[in-house]
Amino acid sequence: MFQVVYFQVFNQHIVIHLITQFKKIIHFLFKNYKWAKKMKAAGIKIIYSIPGLKVHAKIALIKRKEINRIQYYSVLATGNFNESTAKFYTDHILFTTQKNLVKEMELLFIFLAYRKKADQFPCLQFNHLLVAQFNLQQKFISLINREIENANKGIPGRIVIKLNNLEEKVLIQKLYDASNAGVQVQLIVRSICCLIPGVKNMSENITVTRIVDRNLEHGRIFIFHNNGNTEIYMGSADWMNRNIYRRIEVCFPIPDEKIKKQLTEIINIQLSDSVKAVSLNNVLENIPVIATNNPVQSQKMIC
């Protein structure tokens, strides 16, 4: 694997530097191999993903023997279980015994244990989890379409999405369709954003902001107004080609109203940030958000 870096020198020629990543890859391979050996020695079964299909989902299923019964616990997250990144990444974790999620987590782990591709399991269905390679993109399209249908009926439509990266063309086009239908779309995109906001007859109802502060914004949150019956999802998937088409990703619904309220409050604070936020204009320039009377620094308020 090579990283290609382009930069322009004083004589206006483009110089291409190939920077090898072999040492970095070898380091991680050796580290993973070392830990795999230790875990195997302790009696832990290791299942490797198949080549060409990265498992990017951040999930765990815990089976615990309790008094007179076996209890399952699902852990579903937006970020890695990593002691290093946990120091400066902001992420969210749902810890639940909700039976529908537990059941589908079991199905997903069974699928991963077979080490096959998704198209070899045409009968495997997920009705609650959103799993890339199975139903993730289709479900998000359906959720956007519902907001469009409501807007066409005169019912206010609203979508709020927080991502690291936004690149995948099909989902971007659906957001344009939503904007043209009158749906208010608010995006918080930390890094890559291929959607152009604020263009008349294309994206005039879409705003894009990003927050760069002490901690790296890493969570993925998806909020759909649904005529007042708000649905909220979180998960591991950015809207990029690699996440949608070449990885196993998991997004999951938030069933608890208290958690929904908490997440909505967090997102509203971030949308109000006037200290560390910038907005993207229709030529994708970062425009600082100017504080008015009461400046808001979202990370300080949330922490």
Residue ranges and their predicted role:
Residues 3-4, 8:
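Extreme N-terminal basic, low-complexity initiation segments
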Residues 116-129, 154-156:
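Gly-rich Lys/Arg/Thr-decorated short loops/hinges at beta-loop-alpha junctions or inter-strand turns
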Residues 9-80, 84-85, 95, 100-102, ...:
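PLD/PLD-like phosphodiesterase catalytic module centered on the HKD motif
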Residues 87, 107-118:
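Prokaryote-biased recognition of long, low-complexity C-terminal linker/tail segments
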